[in-house]
Curated annotation (Swiss-Prot):
Gene giving rise to this polypeptide: tpiA
Residues at the catalytic site: 93 (electrophile), 141 (proton acceptor)
Subcellular localization: Cytoplasm
Name of protein: Triosephosphate isomerase
Task performed by this protein: Involved in the gluconeogenesis. Catalyzes stereospecifically the conversion of dihydroxyacetone phosphate (DHAP) to D-glyceraldehyde-3-phosphate (G3P).
Taxonomic lineage: Archaea, Methanobacteriati, Methanobacteriota, Stenosarchaea group, Methanomicrobia
Catalyzed reaction equations: D-glyceraldehyde 3-phosphate = dihydroxyacetone phosphate
Single GO BP term: glyceraldehyde-3-phosphate biosynthetic process
Subunit and partners: Homotetramer; dimer of dimers.
One Gene Ontology cellular component annotation held by this UniProt entry: cytosol
Organism: Methanosarcina acetivorans (strain ATCC 35395 / DSM 2834 / JCM 12185 / C2A)
């Protein structure tokens, strides 16, 4: 994945459900082609196959469990999401928190199935710990700022720069994404200036009246 990398999390917003998931993915694809910036989406689990079947762009799962084939009713199996069309997964989002053991198991399963892993964290120490596990990305998102419209890159820039420094010391191969409150061009520019390689965002684009226009605004200062 190139830098900057934009990962759009649909969460369970109505606008990103069903056919809406496809339409937002099409907007992401169009902006990505126009700009050369890689944009990936994380739709709800049942929509992964729908989006993958209609739009060519990287798709991430919002969650996966560290389980294999067998008696794991209700769990998210890595092989299933990969065959549905996903190329990666979020792990430990603040709205879907896991224990350390579960994070390790999910990451191990992601690697087993060749899925790119984004471990979400909430402060510098947890970011450092996550980097030691060697995911592809860590995404720093203070939970109090998620969905607030107040970007972490402005509200708490030290947590971003501190996370970037901590990860560089532990494993320079792990990339850092900045999340929470990201929605405008100034937010992405600030995140990149603080050393992150991209952003993880959601409502600012998914709930926008015109997601394509919102994405174009997001990347205008890159």
């Amino acid at each position: 994945m190139g830098s900057p990398f934009i990962l759009l999390n649909y969460k369970t917003y109505n606008q990103g459900t069903g056919q809406g998931a496809v339409e937002i993915a099409r907007a992401c694809r169009a902006v990505s082609e126009e700009s050369g910036i890689e944009i990936a989406v994380a739709p709800q689990l049942p929509d992964i196959y729908r989006v993958a079947s209609e739009v060519e762009l990287p798709i991430f799962s919002q969650h996966m469990d560290g389980v294999g084939a067998g008696s794991f009713t209700g769990h998210v199996f890595g092989k299933c999401i990969k065959e549905a069309g996903a190329v990666g997964t979020l792990i430990n989002h603040s709205e879907r928190r896991l224990t350390l053991a579960e994070i390790e198991a999910s990451l191990k399963a992601a690697k087993e199935f060749g899925l790119r892993a984004v471990i979400c964290t909430n402060n510098v120490p947890t970011t450092a710990a996550a980097a030691a596990l060697e995911p592809d990305y860590v995404a720093i998102e203070p939970p109090e700022l998620i969905g607030s419209g107040i970007p972490v890159s402005k509200a708490d820039p030290e947590v971003v720069s501190g996370s970037v420094e901590a990860v560089a010391k532990i494993n320079s191969g792990v990339k850092v994404l900045c999340g929470a409150g990201i929605s405008k061009g100034e937010d992405l520019r600030a995140a990149l200036d603080l050393g992150s390689q991209g952003v993880l965002l959601a409502s600012g684009i998914v709930k926008a009246a015109d997601p394509k226009a919102a994405l174009e605004d997001l990347i205008r200062l890159v």
